Amino acid sequence: MSSVKRRKTDKNPSLEGLKSKKTKESKKESHTPSPEPIEDTEDNRVIEETEEAEEDDAPKSFKDLGIVDSLCEACDTLGYKAPTPIQRESIPLALQGRDLIGLAETGSGKTAAFALPILQALLDKPQPLFGLVLAPTRELAYQISQQFEALGSVIRVKCAVIVGGMDMVPQSIALGKKPHIIVATPGRLLDHLENTKGFSLRSLKYLVMDEADRLLDLDFGPILDKILKVLPRERRTYLFSATISSKVESLQRASLKDPLRVSISSNKYQTVSTLIQNYIFIPLIHKDTYLIYLLNEFAGQSAIIFTRTVNETQRIAILLRTLGFGAIPLHGQLSQSSRLGALNKFRAGSREILVATDVAARGLDIPSVDVVLNYDVPQDSKTYIHRVGRTARAGKSGHAISVVTQYDLEIFMRIEAALGKKQVEYPTVKDEVMVFKPRVEEAQRHARNEMKNLHEDRGKKGAVLKGRRPANGAKRGRDEMDREEG
């Protein structure tokens, strides 16, 4: 399909008019209550660290931060030329033996910020079962493990990934080999702590809770409480999160000792300066046609399309493949091997478009993403931040476009209010967009038939795809898979 040249058009007056009518109401409803203040007690002191130092005074290398030569060489090998702000602020404090709360925007280098101090401590005093990292999703757990192994290759660090959806027997064998680092989702780790003979974390030295806000969003709180009770009190604990909430504050009070807070983002809902953010305001009936138009506008670039449901993820992937796009779906109803396969194909460039539910929105390191398309507007500002954080990473530029229909306006205005910034409408010409309509309608018919066959083939499994509640009546989360991590 040929690319369509873009022409500038005036902003859609109907959207601006609707926005102005709703501004008062939006301001009221978008107000988010602040977390409860943290008492400044001796056991629970939080010191704000901000990125206000002059650039000339900032450490220029990992060696300047106190990282040993062997780990600095690993950083060089991986292409880490200079520490990121979160690494500059947190690593020296971690090397001093302090507990940390790290708050930074997505794509800021948080993993290396906690991995390097742990590896340096392990190098100084080697022992098995040295560190534990808890992550909300399987993909993030595998990614963290890969980064630990890459950074720790010079000291031959051994990692074990313990996640739900996999056979427990090989995991028990891996734990029996006493790895240095365990990276786990909370539910499956608790299974092993309760059921795997001889497995204990009594000698653990370091605990990391990564993406802590999402761990709590997914109702892992009670499981975390049980895990914390069996860990030694004399340990170092790092809590990393893109956002702060009252739940996260409660978790840090329960798990950290005299922590320091490293906060890089000045805004609760901060996006990086290299990210271009736009929207298009369109009728719902033409949503697919405008999506194809946008993909042609960004032809040859890698893109993630975010949808709200598993059903839409499947349908759009079929629609795009019918039209000749290299698209692959990623959602919670896929098997673990299928999900990892989808990610690997996208990373390798054999598929240029990933169609995903919010399971892909947090923590996945896909450096080559050029464009994020919010086919469905996210339901809250935090989800928006984490979606668009898939592009414009590590100083690179990126583009995010939200498809806003007449039914999404109020939510979108709340997101704008939280960001503190009005977005600019992406210029489109309706006549040029409608050129795609006949082929899109044909592809839609094909996708409907494929989805019907898919539902029939899957039988009971199709109940989730059709949006029904799970049989056990469990509350549905942002993505069904995330609730099955244990």
Curated annotation (Swiss-Prot):
Transmembrane domains' residue ranges:
none
- Region (Disordered) spans which residues? 1-60, 447-486
Residues the entry annotates as binding ATP: A104, E105, T106, G107, S108, G109, K110, T111
Q: Where is the Helicase ATP-binding domain?
A: 91-262
Sequence motif Q motif, residues: 60-88
Compartments reported by the entry: Nucleus
Write the Enzyme Commission number(s) for this entry: 3.6.4.13
Q: What is its main location?
A: nucleus
Check the record and name the PROSITE patterns matching this protein: DEAD_ATP_HELICASE, HELICASE_ATP_BIND_1, HELICASE_CTER, Q_MOTIF
Known CDD domains for this protein?
A: DEADc_DDX47, SF2_C_DEAD
Describe the location of the Helicase C-terminal domain by residue ranges.
Answer: 286-434
Q: What GO biological process, any one, is recorded here? A: rRNA processing
Q: Which reaction does it catalyse?
A: ATP + H2O = ADP + phosphate + H(+)
| Keyword vocabulary terms for this entry | ATP-binding, Helicase, Hydrolase, Nucleotide-binding, Nucleus, Ribosome biogenesis, RNA-binding, rRNA processing
Q: What class of enzyme is it?
A: hydrolase
Q: Which InterPro entries match?
A: DDX47/Rrp3_DEADc, DEAD/DEAH_box_helicase_dom, DEAD_box_RNA_helicase, Helicase_ATP-bd, Helicase_C-like, P-loop_NTPase, RNA-helicase_DEAD-box_CS, RNA_helicase_DEAD_Q_motif
Q: Give the molecular function GO annotations.
A: ATP binding; ATP hydrolysis activity; RNA binding; RNA helicase activity
Name one cellular component (GO) term. cytosol
Compositionally skewed regions (Basic and acidic residues) per UniProt: 447-460, 476-486
Q: Where is this motif: DEAD box?
A: 210-213
Subunit structure as annotated in this protein's UniProt entry: Interacts with the SSU processome.
Q: What does this protein do?
A: ATP-dependent rRNA helicase required for pre-ribosomal RNA processing. Involved in the maturation of the 35S-pre-rRNA and to its cleavage to mature 18S rRNA.
* Family designation: Belongs to the DEAD box helicase family. DDX47/RRP3 subfamily.
Q: What is known of its domains?
A: The Q motif is unique to and characteristic of the DEAD box family of RNA helicases and controls ATP binding and hydrolysis.
What is this protein's name?
ATP-dependent rRNA helicase rrp3
Organism of derivation: Botryotinia fuckeliana (strain B05.10)
Taxonomic lineage is: Eukaryota, Fungi, Dikarya, Ascomycota, Pezizomycotina
